[in-house]
Amino acid sequence: MAKNKRLTAAQATVERNKPYGLSEAVALVKSNAKAKFDETIEISLNLGIDPRHADQMVRGLISLPNGTGKTLRVGVFARGPKAEEALAAGAEVVGAEDLAEKIQAGEIDFDRCIATPDMMALVGRLGKILGPRGLMPNPRLGTVTMDVKGAITAAKSGQVEYRAEKAGIIHAGVGKASFDEAKLVENINALVDAVQKARPTGAKGTYLKKAALSSTMGPGVRVDVASFEA
């Protein structure tokens, strides 16, 4: 009941169909993040694309200027010296066939998956498990690489993966409620800029149609797309 009352009270502070300027939206979302834990601030971007078409996919990685406030657990497929490099760089899970067996058994104890190129024949067999979870290593995202240390460091330093879902919507965490408003605004503008630059050639008409911000337990707040920094 307390949660429902808190959400109802928070919703009363937000005009449902009003698009707010970015700074005002961030302030509203922060003020309504009153849970006992540090809530994640998430942005939703509604894009004018149809991801079912290969030429309208939007996906990428960006290192947010102020990090995400979340420590990612990293899994790495590698052997020999590269496996040792991964462990030294702070990867939580490192392996080859043994790691594949754990994943097939449902043990997926990581948020980002990295692989050296020679491991992709093995990793490819896990596509039906890793793909739907957004964990499949991808050379275009820098997660299939011989620079294992660099990829792990980037993942742990506030790197965010964004990917448009079937409806053309991107959901991404941009920080924590404890962040200063200015840092959240900077992170959001950086993410939106990356998404804008990733506009696919097949996209027609208005690309960035709608945007909204919310905290883990708070109501959504519409954001005026014109208020993002170009």
Curated annotation (Swiss-Prot):
Record's keyword terms, sorted? Repressor, Ribonucleoprotein, Ribosomal protein, RNA-binding, rRNA-binding, Translation regulation, tRNA-binding
The UniProt entry, under Pfam families, shows: Ribosomal_L1
Identify the domain of life. Answer: Bacteria
Which biological process, per GO, is one annotated for this protein? Answer: regulation of translation
Oligomeric form and interacting partners:
Part of the 50S ribosomal subunit.
Q: Which family does it belong to?
A: Belongs to the universal ribosomal protein uL1 family.
Name of the featured protein: Large ribosomal subunit protein uL1
- The species is Gluconobacter oxydans (strain 621H)
